[in-house]
Amino acid sequence: MGGNNQKMIDILEKVQQSESEVGLRNAACRSLFFVHPHKTAKVCLFLHGFTAGPYQFEPLGKTLFNQGYNVLVPLQPGHGLAGDWNQHNPPPLPTDIKAYLEFVLKWVKIAKTLGEQVVVGGLSSGGTLAAWLALQYPQEIDRALLFTPYLGNQNLLFDLLIKTLPIYFEWFNKDASGNFGYKGFRVPALKIFLELGEQVLKEAQNHPSAPILMVCSESDRAVSRSKQQNFFTAVVKQQPKSWYYCFDDSLEIEHRMMTKLEDNDYEELVITLAKAFIGTDLTWRQFQDIAINIVQGEAYEKIQQEFNLDPQTSQYLSAMMTPHFGCDNLKCINPQGVGVNSKH
């Protein structure tokens, strides 16, 4: 394996070298690779959000690398490039979804050489791509982590505008902390993800999927939470090893939920969910039962054993099921948004 692994590390180094040659708008946009000198049991492939960059997965990537996984966070096509981009000279983002689909398939192939099982994950449009992989290749993908995937806009009017207006759009939060990506884009570049979101939502109704973790937030005003809930409800019927968690509004976790740098003061909670989901094979029913046991006062040490987790992760996960984190009556793990009955 040593030779193969070295060959792959050389390929990853070439990717970063070519990024340096073409010129990136910020060092934070560079592809991130956290790779051990050997093949690991699982390899994680993470896909950043639209107009953003790999920096969104640095905290989670480092954590999972330290847990013994290989981690790949490649820069997506047309993203992160240096240039004076504006409405007269928009960034060169693809307007054909094939560019992204071919890209993710290429990286799944690379990932397979670095781990026995491939875990995929993504934020926003990256989550949409991860959902597509989970549905199209359920035999090849071990599981998919969907962090507030873009399956539609919260405001239906935006869906309509994105489908019809070929305009340049600037992000409302373009100068927000941690925004190292593009400040704007031409709408057709986003339209292709809206269409992909509609496709995966439709396919989930009668198509088996790899296990998925759906993470959403009540404070996310960008994307449709009801569509995320519908997607999860459809998937879990055929894939019982899927989980759902929605952060309460009181935590103020917005759409860019992966890092403290991007205004999520609770980044460790996102990391906790990811670690727990990747490390166990519990079904949705078992996950709910454990949550009910937490509410009924079961010690986190017992949770630690059942989930096969380190003490800190067990403590966080236990706390996340309580009203202290806004999870009244376990509504945070109910895709219908109401409390879960805590009586067996």
Place the predicted regions along the sequence by residue.
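Short, surface-exposed "cap/lid" segments of acyl-processing enzymes
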Residues: R25-H79
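Catalytic histidine neighborhood in serine/cysteine hydrolases
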Residues: L72, V235-M257
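Catalytic active-site module of serine/aspartate enzymes centered on a nucleophile-bearing elbow/loop
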Residues: I253-H344
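Short glycine-enriched nucleophile-adjacent loop
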Residues: G127-P138, A144-L145
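Short alpha-helix in the alpha/beta-hydrolase fold that links the catalytic acid
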Residues: L60, A210, S224-V235, Y244
